[in-house]
Regions:
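Conserved phosphate-coordination/catalytic loops
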Residues: 69, 111, 115, 175, ...
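Conserved beta-strand positions in the central sheet of alpha/beta enzyme cores
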Residues: 29-30, 64-66, 91, 162, ...
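Short, charged, surface-exposed secondary-structure boundary motifs
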Residues: 39-41, 171, 230-236
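Active-site beta-loop-alpha junctions enriched in small/polar residues
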Residues: 8-10, 34-36, 68-70, 95-97, ...
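Alpha/beta enzyme core
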Residues: 18-23, 73-90, 94-104, 115-197, ...
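Glycine-rich, positively charged N-terminal anion/phosphate-binding segment
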Residues: 8-84
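Alpha/beta catalytic cores of nucleotide-metabolism and tRNA/nucleoside-modifying enzymes
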Residues: 1-9, 15, 119-128, 132, ...
Length: 256
């Protein structure tokens, strides 16, 4: 299975990721989310600040750049930039509950606008070319709605969909509901989709992550807050440098 480091705003910057890469490297890392609108519209100083969030070192690879926007053309442009910068994948954020992000029609609010969400995936694909596209989302907005939300996203054939096992309304106030990650896997299988499903939410360590994989059938787990105070979180594998077949398949990496 794939064990990934979750994107966390004001946490998973380049310096933080370098420390994690040194002491316990996950199979793949995500950047903090970056505003595709800002990259398109910000004055020079603001754009330079955003570009700092897209800095990385070879030690952090494979690494995925995450963007948020509600405008497909800007997603396409951001994806094209990420490809130019050498990222291994591009992620579209469709789960962030931040009000300022939602007011832009981005983040979690996209779960209420599946047509636009699909257009953003298409736009990211156009900009990315041969680089894999992924989506990070939740099980629903006010209530679980995977049945009507996920199939539409899967039709766009992203390489990976990460499902945070809570609704937007629940934020992180209730325990993650991993039965919905299992349902996401079932929906994927029913559609005979090749998209990988990662689960996310309340995973304490790699043993816990492996249990979640067994319980749900998901292809891997994204861990976030468990890294706090524990840079060795991912250093529990027999060979932390080994790239799994699943990672190779999702991010087009050669097997080592």
């Amino acid at each position: 299975p794939i064990f990934a480091l979750a994107p966390m705003s004001d946490v998973t910057d380049a310096a933080f990721r370098r420390i994690i890469a040194k002491y316990g490297k996950p199979d793949v890392m995500w950047t903090e989310f970056v505003s595709a609108d800002g990259l398109a519209l910000a004055p020079k100083e603001g754009k330079e600040k955003l570009l700092m969030n897209l800095q990385y070192t070879e030690a952090e690879k494979p690494i995925v750049a995450q963007f948020f926007t509600s405008i497909p053309e800007r997603m396409e442009s951001a994806a094209r930039l990420a490809k130019k910068l050498g990222f291994d994948g591009i992620d579209t954020n469709m789960g962030c509950p931040d009000r300022s992000v939602e007011k832009q029609g981005a983040g979690a609010s996209l779960m209420k606008n599946v047509e636009l969400a699909c257009e953003l995936v298409k736009a990211a694909k156009r900009g990315a070319g041969d680089i894999p596209i992924s989506v990070k989302t939740r099980i629903g907005y006010s209530k679980p709605e995977l049945e009507k939300w996920l199939p539409e996203i899967l039709k766009e054939e992203p390489a990976v969909v990460t499902v945070h096992a809570r609704t937007r309304k629940e934020m992180s106030k209730v325990p993650a509901r991993w039965e919905f990650v299992k349902r996401a896997v079932e929906i994927r299988n029913e559609m005979k989709s090749k998209t990988l499903i990662l689960g996310n939410g309340d995973v304490k360590n790699l043993n816990d992550a492996m249990d979640k994989v067994k319980e749900t059938g998901c292809d891997g787990v994204m861990l976030g807050r468990a890294i706090f105070g524990n840079p060795w979180l991912f250093n529990q594998k027999e060979d932390i440098a080994r790239k799994t077949t699943e990672v190779s398949r999702a991010w087009d990496l050669p097997d080592s």
